[in-house]
Amino acid sequence: MTVEWLAEQLKEHNIELTETQKQQFQTYYRLLVEWNEKMNLTSITDEHDVYLKHFYDSIAPSFYFDFNQPISICDVGAGAGFPSIPLKIMFPQLKVTIVDSLNKRIQFLNYLASELQLQDVSFIHDRAETFGKGVYRESYDVVTARAVARLSVLSELCLPLVKKGGQFVALKSSKGEEELEEAKFAISVLGGNVTETHTFELPEDAGERQMFIIDKKRQTPKKYPRKPGTPNKTPLLEK
């Protein structure tokens, strides 16, 4: 009944799950657990917890941001595909690119996309710092990341990939406000401007989430992102 639980939760936000989408989520869960036995994809494997803390949590940004349009999305450090694969299942017209530094995860995502019959998805084995210096720099409508690093660090990894006029959608847990304050300098330096913040609770008291929508107002200076590892070691902070 877990996929039916997800359907009920989404219905409260006027989102209807089709039978195809239900089957896709069921397949996603099965493959996630199977592959997780061979490699570390997630510490969450209980079926209900996966639907709540991975699937629902990944779809929740669509309550506050319009993903129902033909936009290109880059998901930085998506791990087992969160949030972009659940979003792709819900909004099939999205063009999704996932960048991840671990090749094993890319292998899983390629197999997953094939089994789910997803079109317009690509998975790239690279560090975000290197990827952001290449041909895809400033080419995406939306770049997203889900709690992979502090916001000051995430901004340097993500904002260089956002096209001018696009958005960086940052998904954080409950300490997001502190991180946002610390990250404002970096966001400004990298050409961004925070335009919306949303705070919401997951169902069943599963925790608070915060979502920041950052508009790309100016081009990112060419020197960013810095070389791999530097953003994490020495984040861009106001001196």
Curated annotation (Swiss-Prot):
Pfam families: GidB (PF02527). It is an enzyme of class 2 (transferase). S-adenosyl-L-methionine binds at G77, F82, A128, E129, R146. It comes from the Bacteria. Residues 215-239 are annotated as: Disordered. One of its GO terms (cellular component) is cytosol. Its main location: cytoplasm. It is found in: Cytoplasm. Its EC number is 2.1.1.-. GO terms for molecular function: rRNA (guanine-N7-)-methyltransferase activity. Keywords: Cytoplasm, Methyltransferase, rRNA processing, S-adenosyl-L-methionine, Transferase. SUPFAM superfamilies: S-adenosyl-L-methionine-dependent methyltransferases. Specifically methylates the N7 position of guanine in position 535 of 16S rRNA. Belongs to the methyltransferase superfamily. RNA methyltransferase RsmG family. PANTHER family: S-ADENOSYL-L-METHIONINE-DEPENDENT METHYLTRANSFERASES SUPERFAMILY PROTEIN (PTHR31760:SF0). This is Ribosomal RNA small subunit methyltransferase G. It comes from Staphylococcus aureus (strain MRSA252).
